Every structure is written in structure tokens, then in C-alpha cells.
């Protein structure tokens, strides 16, 4: 280990210990050893399995980001326990999804009648149950699992980018870009499944691109595809349809590739139908909806200006009207959560504020647009297909949700960030890229100011 890495490791260790001392509430007998083990898994994976694109900078990125997430987890556990009157086994979770997933899983683990109403059954509770059955009933257990998944996601995105570009620097840039996506970073510190889902998406893409580029069937990409499909099945079942479109988009002229991807597509459909048929919601003793029963949530409801502008509830709109609103929905999906609302969601956990500072998210979007208009033609076919798949999924998500749930786009980052990293590392395009970023910054400022006025002073636009 060189001197720079030694400094990084020692600084990160001190930061984690300091947070643990200043913010009591976590079960340190689990959390600190778990941090060491998970950190060791990440560094070992990067050093041993990624030798072709390993770099000291990449390892430093992984260690720093993982340590930052662990500190965020300690902060949130303090908030869920000491600050709110809960405990690590019985935390106070104001986020309805987190509350339902945790307490439903705990009731299932204890074999008790369910007092938590789950509107849409999800297999994710079995992941929470399994982790807590092995490591103890502790909110820190699934959160540390999230931290591990975030680190593995960084490595997977780096591997995808290296597979597409064969350039170590571009791979490190992609890893850095993944690590500064503040929304995804925040998701790793709360009990939500978007980070593991992003990892599953990245693993699936890794297998998909390897088959497309190598044009032959081998053991490693098949394992990646199967792991991705299995993970998505447990985390967000409907997203299997997105994986299905990916298998179709990557079909080409090669018969071996087409046969393999057709088989993968068929497997996805079979798994989707089978998983849907097994879904059920057990009878509950008392239905409890967080949105109705939690007074804190009731007090923090806010008017949605976007819904007001739409006029008609989005789910009642015709397909034609949804298509008319689609460009605006995509823009809203890209812009939210707005920076000035950073205190709005801190009731769910102090780290929620981080999600609102998505300036690197905006930067990545600007660079990706530049890639579409200037560098798409000089990129290889695999990168082009991957990027267009990401665009299709982003637009489809906006169409389904009217752009109101931007976190649904987080698992799509592995489809877009390789093109972003490729653009940043292309020296011949630096000057036009900087000019475009300047123009984009002006347009972004004007748009955000307009959105601020619409949200804060809606009566002015009636």
C-alpha cells in the first residue's frame, strides 16, 4: 500500500470511529466489524477481480465513498433511535416504504399476525428477513447491505465502462461519476431498495455487453445475467420488463448472440409470470397506512405544483394526453428533487438532504446530451445501444409516473454513465464540451428559477 492510500484508509477509519462515538444508537458490536468486512470485500473485489482496470485512484474512490456512507448510516441510526426514542431493533421510521418493509419483515420473522398493511406485496421483505435472521434484529444490518451494494455498483460501472472503452482512465471517471450521484449516495443510507437494484442492473449490463462484444457464450456473462434477473425479481419485479427490452435491443446480426439473448428474454418472461403468480398479501389483523396514521407525515404534506399544472390526475389521463406532456415529464424527472427543498425530507433521515444537491446529476445529464449530438457516431455499437436503452427506459419511466418519482431512474445510471465518462475523457472534444456546459448552465439556472417561482408562488401563475 502506497503512502496516499495509507492516508486515505487512516482518515476514513478515524471518521467512522468519530461518528460512532459522537452519534450513539447503533449496535457497534455489529456495525464496526461489518464495516471492516464489507470494506475488505470491496477492496479485494476491486484488486483481484478487476486487475485489468485497477488503479490507486479507483480504490481511493471506493474506500472514501464507502466510509462516507457508513458515517451517514451511523447518523441516520442515531436519528432513528436515540433522537426519536427508538432502538436499533425497533427504530422509528417515518418513511412509509421503510416502515412497511422493516416491520412487515420483522412480523414475518417472528411469525406474528401482520398489523402492517402492504398495498403491493414485494419480495424485498425476504431479503431483510434473511439478513436479520443471520446477523440479528438490527436496522443497521440492511443498511450495511446497502453500503456494500453501493461499493459493488461503483466497481461494476467501472467494469462496464472498461469493457466498452478498454481505457483505464475512462473506467475511473465512470467510477467517480457513480460515486458523486448524491441521490444514489443518500439511498444507501436509508432502508430503500434502489441501491441493490442499481447493482443488479449493473451486473446484468455487464453480462449483456460481454456477450454482445465477445459474440460467444461463456460462463461469466451468463452468471451475471442470472444474478441480475434474480436480484431484480426480489427487489422490483416489474423492472424485469426493462431487462427484457435490454435483451431485445442488444440483438444484432450474429446468430449466436441472438440465440443467447432470445433465451435470456424467454427466461425473463417465465420468471416474471411465475413470480407474479406467487405474489400474495397475507390477511392482516389491522390495516395501518402510514400516510393516514402517522401525524408527522400528515403535517409535512405539501402541495405538488406539477399536479396542479397537469390539471387532471395523471392516472386518469388518456395515452395521447400523456404523450403530449411527456417532454415536460422527462424534464421534471431530471430536475427533481429541487435543491431548495433540501430540508423537506430530513424527517425521514438527516442524510435525505444530500439527495437535493444533485448538481453532478445535472452535469452528467449535460455531458450525456453532448455525447448524443457530438460523439455518438465515434462510439462503439455496444455503448450506443446501451445508451439508447437507457434513454428509452428513462422516457418510459417518465411516461408511467409523469416524472414525479426521479429515484426510479437511479437503476438506469449504469446505462448512461459509460457514455458520460467516455465524453469527459475525450481530449479532442474538451473545448466544445466546455462551451456547451456553459450554455447548459445558463439554461439550467433559468429553468430552476422558473420552477422555484412555480412551486413557491403558484398563485402568480393562475
Annotate each PLM feature.
Residues 185-186, 220-239, 243-251:
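Membrane-interface alpha helices of multi-pass inner-membrane proteins
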Residues 189-197:
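Short acidic/glycine- and proline-prone juxtamembrane loop motifs at membrane-interface regions
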Residues 6-16, 65, 224-225, 378-398:
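Transmembrane alpha-helix segments characteristic
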Residues 43-44, 158, 329, 333-380:
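Hydrophobic, aromatic-rich transmembrane alpha-helices
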Residues 163, 169, 214-221, 345-351, ...:
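Membrane-interface helix-loop-helix junctions at transmembrane boundaries of multi-pass membrane enzymes
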Residues 78-102, 113-127, 136-137, 338, ...:
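Extracytoplasmic catalytic/substrate-binding loops of multi-pass membrane glycan-assembly enzymes
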Residues 40-47, 144-164, 367-371:
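Transmembrane-helix motifs of polytopic, lipid-linked glycan transferases
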Residues 157-180:
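Transmembrane-helix signature of polytopic, membrane-embedded enzymes
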Amino acid at each position: 500500500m502506497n503512502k496516499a492510500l495509507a492516508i486515505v484508509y487512516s482518515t476514513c477509519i478515524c471518521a467512522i470511529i468519530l461518528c460512532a462515538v459522537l452519534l450513539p444508537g447503533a449496535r457497534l458490536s455489529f456495525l464496526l466489524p461489518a464495516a471492516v468486512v464489507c470494506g475488505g470485500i470491496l477492496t479485494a473485489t476491486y484488486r483481484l477481480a478487476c486487475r485489468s482496470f485497477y488503479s490507486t485512484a479507483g480504490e481511493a474512490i471506493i474506500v472514501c465513498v464507502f466510509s462516507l456512507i457508513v458515517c451517514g448510516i451511523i447518523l441516520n441510526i442515531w436519528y432513528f433511535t436515540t433522537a426519536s426514542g427508538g432502538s436499533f431493533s425497533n427504530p422509528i421510521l417515518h418513511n412509509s416504504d421503510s416502515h412497511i418493509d422493516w416491520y412487515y419483515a420483522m412480523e414475518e420473522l417472528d411469525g406474528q399476525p401482520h398489523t402492517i398493511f402492504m398495498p403491493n406485496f414485494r419480495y424485498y421483505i425476504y431479503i431483510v428477513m434473511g439478513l436479520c435472521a443471520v446477523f440479528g434484529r438490527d436496522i443497521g444490518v440492511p443498511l450495511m447491505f446497502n453500503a456494500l451494494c453501493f461499493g459493488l455498483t461503483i466497481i461494476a460501472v467501472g467494469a462496464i465502462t472498461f469493457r466498452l472503452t478498454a481505457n483505464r482512465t475512462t473506467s475511473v471517471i465512470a467510477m467517480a461519476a457513480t460515486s458523486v450521484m448524491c441521490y444514489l449516495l443518500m439511498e444507501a443510507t436509508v432502508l430503500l431498495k434502489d441501491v441493490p437494484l442499481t447493482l443488479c442492473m449493473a451486473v446484468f449490463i455487464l453480462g449483456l455487453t460481454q456477450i454482445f462484444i465477445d459474440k460467444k457464450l461463456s460462463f461469466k456473462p451468463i452468471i451475471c445475467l442470472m444474478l441480475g434477473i434474480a436480484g431484480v425479481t426480489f427487489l422490483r419485479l416489474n423492472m424485469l420488463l426493462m431487462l427484457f427490452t435490454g435483451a431485445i435491443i442488444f440483438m444484432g446480426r450474429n446468430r449466436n448472440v441472438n440465440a443467447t439473448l432470445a433465451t435470456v428474454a424467454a427466461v425473463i418472461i417465465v420468471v416474471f409470470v411465475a413470480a407474479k403468480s406467487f405474489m400474495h398479501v397475507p390477511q392482516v389483523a389491522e390495516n395501518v397506512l402510514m400516510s393516514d396514521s402517522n401525524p408527522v407525515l400528515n403535517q409535512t404534506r405539501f402541495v405538488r405544483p406539477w399536479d396542479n399544472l397537469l390539471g387532471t390526475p395523471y392516472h386518469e389521463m388518456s395515452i395521447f394526453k400523456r404523450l403530449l406532456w411527456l417532454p415536460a415529464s422527462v424534464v421534471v424527472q431530471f430536475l427533481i428533487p429541487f435543491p431548495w427543498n433540501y430540508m423537506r425530507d430530513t424527517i425521514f433521515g438527516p442524510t435525505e438532504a444530500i439527495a437535493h444537491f444533485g448538481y453532478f446529476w445535472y452535469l452528467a445529464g449535460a455531458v450525456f446530451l453532448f455525447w448524443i449530438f457530438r460523439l455518438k457516431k465515434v462510439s462503439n455499437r455496444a455503448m450506443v445501444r446501451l445508451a439508447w436503452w437507457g434513454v428509452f427506459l428513462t422516457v418510459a419511466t417518465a411516461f408511467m409516473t409523469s416524472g414525479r418519482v426521479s429515484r426510479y431512474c437511479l437503476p438506469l445510471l449504469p446505462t448512461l454513465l459509460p457514455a458520460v465518462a467516455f465524453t469527459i475523457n475525450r481530449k479532442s472534444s474538451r473545448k466544445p464540451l466546455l462551451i456547451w456546459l456553459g450554455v447548459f448552465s445558463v439554461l439550467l439556472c433559468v429553468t430552476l428559477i422558473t420552477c422555484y417561482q412555480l412551486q413557491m408562488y403558484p398563485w402568480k401563475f393562475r
